[in-house]
Amino acid sequence: MTLYLLAQVFSAIGALCVAISSFAKSKNKMLVWQITDYIFTAIANLLLGGYTGALTISISIIRNSLMVKKKMTKTILTILIIIQIIVGTYLNQLGIIGYLPIISSVSYSLAIATTPNLQWLRWVIIENMLLWLIYDLTIQAYPAAITDVTITLTTLIAIIRNRKTFSKQ
């Protein structure tokens, strides 16, 4: 029970960080807040037995760190995606549901690498949160699931607040 509660605390801290990231004014600031989220969320997933999720998040830390440092290349991104798919498939114990974090991360990796448009990235965050919602409900990470819904809603607010910038980028 203590590990479960600790996992929920880590999940809540991560959720706060990702919510802040959705209001970031630059791609780099968004990525840094997401790295912070990923660290806490990976620990929470490990404590809850969500190994595919923890792996996916760990690779996302590497991806975002390389992007912040401007060291990401198409080759490195491709290698990270392939590793994620292969190792994620190996660790998957949840059938189709276990692939949702992988799908989420691959789609975000491609989006973050191909567009500087924050509004588009916010839409991809919504897609990701909905996939994570299903995964979190499956591993019974209910507070994380509530967080997924909250992040979806806060990101929608950020999209509405910044809708003028969407057409300009």
Segments from the language model and where they lie:
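Alpha-helical membrane-protein topology signature
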Residues: M1-Q169
